[in-house]
UniProtKB/Swiss-Prot annotation:
The modification Phosphoserine is found at S29, S67, S178, S193, S201, S213, S319, S327, S413, S428. Pfam families: FAM117. It comes from Homo sapiens (Human). Keywords: Coiled coil, Phosphoprotein. Belongs to the FAM117 family. This is Protein FAM117A. Residues 269-278 have a biased composition (Low complexity). Residues 1-45, 159-201, 269-320, 406-453 are annotated as: Disordered.
Length: 453
């Protein structure tokens, strides 16, 4: 039996060429010389031959024993082969493929064969028993997930317990009347909301506009962990820094707040304005309207009723003043909330829209025509004398002077009469007109204008 096991192991585990003609030879092989071809067909030294167990022991192990090597103490068999010559296999693929897959080959006849390895790689017997018990008792169950009904029932029970404890705790804390920084209309709405819910309601959810503005808040986490609209929660929501708040989603007609038109009667009669709708629609629009109402309500009445206030025109008729807008609008109907930096002039926005009163004169950029007179001294379209200077030369003036030095100088004419010299007329055959000819003593000056300065 031991020889048959060794022969079958050699033929099935190490390939078709190792067990003697594809595993057909199952008897105990006689000792072969070292040079014979049968010497390479023997199993490796790490495999120790042993006797098979009884058939009833194999049935107790079940189908699990086929994939796990049996750990049996090696016994000295009667038919022990001679000391073998250690040789390596032709390829490691034949060994590693079955080893990595965890599939031990069986005999061709279906007989169960089992091999015991060295003690260094031997599996303890207790492991095999534990594996068998685990396979028989525990079937492969699906891991607990969020979709299982048992898990959902446990979560619903926990949520109901948390809700009851938080409702009782919040009722005691709100009776103490802790102050809340912010809008009191929202606080009153939040105080009235928890008792309105029945005790059996599964989850207290935040309003859709508020929970979208929180970062990292999923709907799954909100369902698991109960979020209550309490004072601490509201303060934590309102303390989100600028730039980290998501924009408010566009809502239907219930959440659309029209811009507040502030009339002088409203400013005088209502010193503290409250919001029309107590439930906040969007966090950004809610703070925006609240800041506009607080700042405009804090304005004193004398300042609001003064004619210099931008809410009024010169004739006393009120102009519609919108609340502090988030962005400027093209119709000049907004007020800047920020003050100008140091060194800059504060400019009123509504100065361009206001019409001047009857006592104020209309200022223009041009000078007044009644006070400024323009007296033209010449024209730009006068003819230009190219060959004659504007004033006669000094030589021409002294030449025309009389011999008496005490007599006054006659007024010099700008255009003297031409001299009739036959030699000069013969010498200059150029076709010049008489007024264009100049005496030889004068020097020509180019591009002289006839404008009188």
């Amino acid at each position: 039996m031991a020889g048959a096991a060794a022969g079958g192991r050699g033929g099935g585990a190490w390939g078709p060429g190792r067990g003697g003609a594809g595993g057909l030879r199952r008897g105990c092989s006689p000792p072969a010389p070292a040079g014979s071809p049968r010497a390479g067909l023997q199993p490796l030294r790490a495999t120790i031959p042993f006797q098979l167990q009884q058939p009833h022991q194999r049935r107790d192990g079940g189908g699990r024993a086929a994939s796990v090597p049996c750990s049996v103490a090696p016994e000295k068999s009667v038919c022990r082969p001679q000391p073998l010559q250690v040789r390596r296999t032709f390829s490691l693929d034949t060994i590693l493929s079955s080893y990595l897959l965890g599939q031990w080959p069986r005999d061709a006849d279906g007989a169960f064969t089992c091999c015991t390895n060295d003690k260094a790689t031997q599996t303890p017997l207790s492991w095999q028993e534990l594996e068998g018990e685990r396979a028989s008792s525990c079937a492969h169950k699906r891991s607990a997930s969020w979709g299982s009904t048992d898990h959902r029932k446990e979560i619903s029970k926990l949520k109901q317990q948390l809700q009851r404890t938080k409702l009782s705790r919040s009722g005691k804390e709100k009776e103490r009347g802790s102050p809340l920084l912010g809008d009191h209309a929202v606080r009153g709405a939040l105080r009235a909301s928890p008792p309105s819910f029945p005790s059996g309601s599964p989850v207290l959810r935040l309003s859709p506009c508020l929970h979208r503005s929180l970062e990292g808040l999923n709907q799954e986490l909100e369902e698991v962990f109960v979020k209550e609209q309490g004072e601490e929660e509201l303060l934590r929501i309102l303390d989100i820094p600028d730039g980290h708040r998501a924009p408010a989603p566009p809502q239907s007609g219930s959440c659309d707040h029209p811009l507040l038109l502030l009339e002088p009667g409203n400013l005088a009669s209502s010193p503290s304005m409250s919001l029309a709708s107590p439930q906040p629609c969007g966090l950004a629009s809610h703070e925006e309207h609240r800041g506009a109402a607080e700042e405009l309500a804090s304005t004193p009445n004398d300042k609001a009723s003064s004619p210099g206030h931008p809410a009024f025109l010169e004739d006393g008729s009120p102009s519609p003043v919108l609340a502090f807008a988030a962005s400027p609008r093209p119709n000049h109907s907004y007020i800047f909330k920020r003050e100008p930096p140091e060194g800059c002039e504060k400019v009123r926005v509504f100065e361009e829209a206001t019409s001047p009163g009857p006592d104020l004169a209309f200022l223009t950029s041009c000078p007044d025509k009644n006070k400024v007179h323009f007296n033209p001294t010449g024209s730009a379209f006068c003819p230009v004398n190219l060959m004659k200077p504007l004033f006669p030369g000094m030589g021409f003036i002294f030449r025309n002077c009389p011999s008496n030095p005490g007599s006054p100088l006659p007024p010099a004419s700008p255009r003297p009469p031409p001299r009739k010299d036959p030699e000069a007329s013969k010498a200059s055959p150029l076709p010049f007109e008489p007024w264009q000819r100049t005496p030889p003593s004068e020097e020509p000056v180019l591009f002289q204008s006839s404008l009188m300065v």
